Amino acid sequence: MKKADFVHSRLSPLLRALDDDILAVSYGKVGTKEHVYIIFDGGYLAIDVSGLDNAGITELVIRRLIRNDRSSK
């Protein structure tokens, strides 16, 4: 499955079910850089996922969300 399809069809529903503050999850690629964007009501979080497979993207994004949530409290 392509990364963009994975992020939009699998990762986005999972993350939005886990956190009501997440409005959308998107994937973007410019040149060799790949990012997952998590959009909240007051902004967004961009996570560099270059070179990762779908499982790696899921793990990294969840770890970053947990770390981001802890630092905001």
Regions found by a protein language model. Give the residues of each.
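Intrinsically disordered, low-complexity peptide-like regions
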Residues: F6, A17-D19, K33, I39, ...
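Negatively charged, low-complexity tracts enriched in Asp/Glu with abundant Ser/Thr
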Residues: M1-D21
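Short, flexible helical or helix-coil boundary motifs
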Residues: L14, L18-K29, R64-K73
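Acidic, low-complexity, intrinsically disordered interaction modules
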Residues: L23-G56
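Mixed-charge, Lys/Arg-enriched low-complexity segments
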Residues: K2-H8, G56-K73
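Compositionally biased, low-complexity segments enriched in small residues
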Residues: L18, S50-D53, I62
